[in-house]
Each structure stands twice: as structure tokens, then as C-alpha cells.
Amino acid sequence: MSVLTAPRLRRVAETDAHEGPVYAADEDAFYFTTVRRERVAIKRLALAEGTVSVVRADANMANGMALDREGFLLVCEQGTLTEPARISRLDRATGELETVVDSWNGLPLNSPNDVAAARDGTIWFTDPSHGYLQGFRPEPQTGDHVYRYDPASRELTAVLDSLDKPNGLAFSPDERVLYVGDNGAPHHLLAYDVEDGGRPVRGGVLAAFTPEQPDGIKVDEQGRIYASAADGVRILDERGEQIGEIELPGAVNFTFGGPARDVLYITVDTAVWAAELDSKGA
């Protein structure tokens, strides 16, 4: 099925899948974070069996997730009024958990929202003040930044500091362009060239989202950009022109998966849906 036409959707599982979708090819499993209530859990959907299990019952208001180049699960822990926000790293085999980073220049993070791992090992994440605005985090002490963390030097750098509410982020296939969704008013998808050394430059608005907000962002092998909104997943070319859409009301986030990375797994708070494409995730 072409990405330019509506692919057939099938419901994979009924479960409280909200954010952080990650496909682990070595397990043929789909990881996600649950709908925020008193707590948020990290769960695992075994795709072959269709069974859901709890990986971490209380995950500190976890939101976005990604696999790093070693296969560990990077988790955006938004934190609470009493627990600090951080980026953590979870060993899927043992359950061992460690802090990657929890502060910038000695100041606590706001509420990390989404994360992407670059091929050079650096970790990029957005840190909007959503937690404070939603009443489960203290007043922010820093701006709503996009950060780059270098595990080798342990240096955390604010690479973008002019966005209102940065949310989803993803790289182009060659990692020379960084895409970021801004959920402030107005709602935009932005694109930035990434120079050697890992700093975004020469960027700006690629596409406007009205009235919905861009949330999850992914890119396929051809460089097409996929962005979730409340009405489904929109597909844009590198110029920001919409060239397709997967209509699914209530869509929150998504990821490419399957052995060939040609299935889009989409969370909608009450279920996980799948759309088979003839394009592959980058």
C-alpha cells in the first residue's frame, strides 16, 4: 500500500498505550508508556502472541522513549512534584535502570518529552514545561529547550532555546537535518540543518499544523516526514508539503516496526493499531 493513499488499519491490541512507542526487533516487541493517571507504567506488547506485560509499574511519569545504539531503552521521565525529571536508561534484559542526565548547569530538567538517539551515540531530547502546566512538576528553573547529551564527555548542551513547547523530534536519514515539533501557539513543525559537531543551524518553520498539534515525528528511508496529530499521522515531503495521511482519530504517537520496518504502530490511548506501508523507517 502506498504511503500516499490510506493504508488498511488493523487493531493489534486493546491496551492503555499512550506515548513512547518503540519497536525492538530482537524481541519482535513493542514498548510504550501508559495513559497518565496517578502513575505511568512502561509496558511491553509481544506482537506474535498479542500479550501485554508490565516492564516498570511506576516509571516516574515516563513519556517518550527510544533505543540507543547499544539497544538500551532511553526513557524521558517527566518527574513529579517530589521526584526529579531525568533521562534514564533501562536494560531490557535485566531491568537494571540508571540515570543518564537529570540537570543542566546545576538546574533540574523541566519534564523531558521525547528523545532520539543519533548514530554517533549522542542523545537528543526535548524538555518543555508541560509537567508544570499540567500540575505535576514544580515551577521550571530553565527554558523549554532542546538538548544534546554526549555520553562520552557527559556534557549536556542546550542546542535550541527559542521554541515555545518543543515536543517530538527526529533526524533525516543522513542525520543532517533535525525535525522538531513545537506545540506552542501556533503549532509548527520545524527543520534545522545540523552542522559537524552536532549543533542545529539555519532552521525554521517547515509546516504549520492547524488546529491539531504535532506530536510524534519519524522519517522513512526516502526522507519523508511522518507526524502524528489528533486526527491521524500526516506524511510530508522534505519541503513540508503534505503528501498523504493515515486517518486515525485519537492518534497520539507511533513508530516504524516489523522485521522490514514497514509497519507503522500507532498508539491511541485505548489500543495499538498497525498500518502496513510500502515504505520503510529510516
Regions found by a protein language model. Give the residues of each.
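Sequence-structural signature of mature extracellular/luminal beta-sheet repeat domains
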Residues: 1-282
